[in-house]
Amino acid sequence: MAMKKANKLTQTAMIKQILKRCSSLGKKQSNVYGEDENGSPLNVPKGHFVVYVGENRVRYVVPISFLTRPEFQLLLQQAEEEFGFDHDMGLTIPCEEVVFRSLTSMLR
């Protein structure tokens, strides 16, 4: 009886270890939007955020200070009108990349 109980405990411990390894594997992977398991974008410096621009949804990292600029706020209004903010695509700016790069270079 004691042997069966010890064997059962060992199996339980092994199963827990396997489950722990499986769950930690998922944490190391990112999703298609380059986000970690908490939904935070990878490789984004503090004080910045990610936007996706144009038809090809090219990823740009921009400073948070842009949020106070009226020019950038217009882009956000366009994004809200076209996509809304309740979707799984990340913050998408509906303008051509050339226009976006030009605007952001002026804002810097």
From Swiss-Prot:
Belongs to the ARG7 family. The keyword Cell membrane applies. InterPro entries: SAUR_fam. This is Protein SMALL AUXIN UP-REGULATED RNA 51. Expressed in organ primordia. Hardly observed in leaves. One of its GO terms (biological process) is response to auxin. It comes from the Eukaryota. Coiled coil: none annotated. The keyword Membrane applies. It is found in: Cell membrane. Induction: Induced by zeatin. Repressed by abscisic acid. Provide a mechanistic link between auxin and plasma membrane H(+)-ATPases (PM H(+)-ATPases, e.g. AHA1 and AHA2), and triggers PM H(+)-ATPases activity by promoting phosphorylation of their C-terminal autoinhibitory domain as a result of PP2C-D subfamily of type 2C phosphatases inhibition, thus leading to the acidification of the apoplast and the facilitation of solutes and water uptake to drive cell expansion. Triggers plant growth probably by promoting cell elongation. Regulates branch angles and bending. It is a peripheral membrane protein. One of its GO terms (cellular component) is plasma membrane. Keywords: Cell membrane, Developmental protein, Growth regulation, Membrane. Transmembrane segments: none annotated.
